[in-house]
Amino acid sequence: MKNYTYASLLALLLLASTTWVTAQNVLVNTTKKYNNIKQIEVESGWLDVSYQGGEGTEVSVEAYLESNIADQDIVFATLGDVLKISYKSSSEKYNWNSKSKGYIKITGPVALALEVSGTSGNISIQNLESKLTTLQLTSGNVAATQIKGNLTLTATSGTLIAKEVDGDVNARLTSGNTSLDGIKGAVDYGSTSGNFTAKNIGGLLNVQLTSGNAKLENVKELGTMKITSGNMTAVNAGLGSKTQFSGTSGNFTLQTPSDLGAFNYTLRATSGNLRVGNTSKEKSLDINNNAANTVRGNITSGNITITN
């Protein structure tokens, strides 16, 4: 009977301890409004961040932070027309039982410079106009829609999405997938591992993938296409003075609206087939059309196919 009593008491103590550890407290729950803000800088930590541009000039920030770990805060500071929002934590007590949730939701004018940097979570930006918008995340998802101006996206792992950008896009992702659609300017993209999809690109497109596949559609001009291991498929993608293909293992398959006779071609494959229009060869294909520009390609194991 005593053993049963002791066991019951121990179970109750463990349950109480677990309940105490996992109890969540609201640390931040506030809405702040600002006028005459031209630039916002956010250091979000693990918090989700969103920005919605709209009519008016007032900036409104809704911040919420709930956690079972104390010593966390969201700090606001203004310096002239710059608003700085920072997640702060002085605690190192995180463990397997840590539970937290929170966000920073911002609404404000369309014309505003924005820079967001975080460690994890999600970043979602819509309807923004600035010379440069910078979004950086260690792990998580980054999405930007209806952006006027240049856009920089960076993440170590996760997903990058950009749509309707009236400017250039520079994107870097270590591991994960990226989707771009409706980019009026040039695109420079690099990734170590993952898949890349790009549609309706109005400028020069450069792609560098260590491992993964690239699917391209409606691209004004292809630049450097470098894929160490993987495949590139392009439909309605233009050739230009900077077009070149480089790969170790995989295939480059391109359907282009460009005049094939307006370019020279120097293509090489250690093991594989090479084709331009109706002309195909193994290992080496040289076509001299007395053109001003030459399309170059080199693949160790795989094929390069360029057709109309």
Question: Which residues does each PLM region occupy?
Answer:
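Intrinsically disordered, low-complexity terminal regions
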Residues: 1-308
